[in-house]
Curated annotation (Swiss-Prot):
It holds the Pfam family Flu_NP. It comes from Influenza A virus (strain A/Duck/Hong Kong/7/1975 H3N2). It comes from the Viruses. This is Nucleoprotein. A motif (Bipartite nuclear localization signal) lies at residues 198-216. Residues 1-21 are annotated as: Disordered.
């Protein structure tokens, strides 16, 4: 990790804290998830949910969305100023599923946002606890990353749909703060920036006046976030060019797309955190676990251990495979949508299959789906081993930038090679190396050409038994070097639509 003196760890970002030592960080992250758990228990009481209904992931998601909506200041203000038919700006709600006479029923509930905010604050010692809200946003984002493809969004901004491995966090709301920025992939940042530049091209007032000044500050901040994700000097220098541009236009869009492509091999550092559904924290708190006293980390053994002892259920549609539904949620819980399937399978202890082979749709149930035929089953969220989360991107030391298969952004710090189809990636780099960024482009292409798919990343890093609390005995798995593991291969998932 570069310059640890200036960077805050992501738990500090998550909890909005200044620099803290490890124990303080564990305590404040514990306080955060404990607050989520207390809130969830209180909501289950309010809604009179049975134990089984409270463990239903669809109910958890509805409750999470309600609290996020209750605290969405900007949208609340907008709704009050632009009243739309049938939307009460002061209320929030969603579907709650109840078990009645051996069948699942859907009930639409409506609550005052004020009431939800009161319950949330009460569960969080009277504070707004924005960190907890961000945590829920990241869990929803990780679930979207595992469930949907963003091909359309990529194509719309002029990027290649094969760059899907760069799109972590692409559905995170803007208000997700520093913790949200840490988990966004290179492609996500590039896409946000391209959208901004395009607006500037089409609307000549976008960069002007008082508003334009604020826009400009936001633009430069996003550029700096993206620059911080790159690990080579040439990529960072190109980001400086993009940031300092007087009047961002097509040249900047070109540069950004070039950088996004380069990140397929010279990978950016993107944080991965295990954010679990609220009901999981609720179950632990209800069983008497004191998160703040025990401490908690999003990147160590804790989430694995929590999932080992939690029973969560999900509604299952008639022709869905419960094991596949479990895989989807497992990947979301570990933020592993862009991880190599060989690594995920090894850690999970059961084969993790590419999304194109999953017989399951998303976790959420649309309001027009027939409840008569709905069944429910237990989600298998346990793992055989555990591994440390990484944010390095897995670049090997010799060039601080190594091979990345067209679809991997490593989640776990586990030794493996990162296979990639060099021909496919390099084909995108023909042509334009002139202009003011020519020397940087040449340098980036040179580094990419020298990357080898067989290079080993995370040298010596292994997985650990779940009983190995202090991570003393790494088990280094050996993988078939030729066999790459892209989750998005042969993909037929549905698009993400807001």
């Amino acid at each position: 990790m570069a310059s640890q003196g200036t960077k805050r760890s992501y738990e500090q970002m998550e909890t909005g804290g200044e620099r803290q030592n490890a124990t303080e960080i564990r305590a404040s992250v514990g306080r955060m998830v404990g607050g989520i758990g207390r809130f969830y228990i209180q909501m289950c009481t309010e809604l009179k949910l049975s134990d089984y209904e409270g463990r239903l992931i669809q109910n958890s998601i509805t409750i999470e969305r309600m609290v996020l909506s209750a605290f969405d200041e900007r949208r609340n203000k907008y709704l009050e100023e632009h009243p739309s038919a049938g939307k009460d700006p002061k209320k929030t709600g969603g579907p709650i599923y109840r078990r009645r006479d051996g069948k699942w029923m859907r009930e639409l509930i409506l609550y005052d946002k004020e009431e939800i905010r009161r319950i949330w604050r009460q569960a969080n010692n009277g504070e707004d606890a924005t960190a907890g809200l961000t945590h829920l946003m990241i869990w929803h984002s990780n679930l979207n990353d595992a469930t949907y493809q963003r091909t359309r969004a990529l194509v719309r901004t002029g990027m290649d749909p094969r760059m899907c491995s760069l799109m972590q966090g692409s559905t995170l709301p803007r208000r997700s703060g520093a913790a949200g920025a840490a988990v966004k992939g290179v492609g996500t940042m590039v896409m946000e920036l391209i959208r901004m530049v395009k607006r500037g091209i089409n609307d000549r007032n976008f960069w002007r006046g008082e508003n334009g000044r604020r826009t400009r500050i936001a633009y430069e901040r996003m550029c700096n976030i993206l620059k911080g994700k790159f690990q080579t000097a040439a990529q960072r220098a190109m980001m400086d060019q993009v940031r300092e541009s007087r009047n961002p236009g097509n040249a900047e869009i070109e540069d950004l797309i070039f950088l996004a492509r380069s990140a397929l091999i010279l990978r950016g550092s993107v944080a991965h955190k295990s954010c679990l559904p609220a009901c999981v924290y609720g179950l632990a708190v209800a069983s008497g676990y004191d998160f703040e006293r025990e401490g908690y980390s999003l990147v160590g053994i804790d989430p694995f251990r929590l999932l080992q002892n939690s029973q969560v259920f999900s509604l299952i549609r008639p022709n869905e495979n419960p094991a596949h539904k479990s895989q989807l949620v497992w990947m979301a819980c570990h933020s592993a949508a862009f991880e190599d399937l060989r690594v995920s399978s090894f850690i999970r202890g059961t084969r993790v299959v590419p999304r194109g082979q999953l017989s399951t749709r998303g976790v959420q149930i649309a309001s027009n789906e027939n409840m008569e035929t709905m069944d429910s089953s237990t989600l298998e969220l346990r793992s055989r081993y555990r591994a440390i989360r990484t944010r390095s991107g897995g670049n090997t030391n010799q060039q601080r930038a190594s091979a990345g298969q067209i679809s991997v952004q490593p989640t776990f710090s586990v030794q493996r090679n990162l296979p990639f189809e060099r021909a496919t990636i390099m084909a995108a780099f023909t042509g334009n190396t002139e202009g003011r960024t020519s020397d940087m482009r040449t340098e980036i292409i040179r580094m990419m050409e020298s990357a080898r798919p067989e290079d080993v990343s995370f040298q010596g890093r292994g997985v650990f038994e779940l009983s190995d609390e202090k991570a003393t005995n790494p088990i280094v798995p050996s993988f078939d070097m030729s066999n790459e593991g892209s989750y998005f291969f042969g993909d037929n998932a549905e698009e993400y639509d807001n």
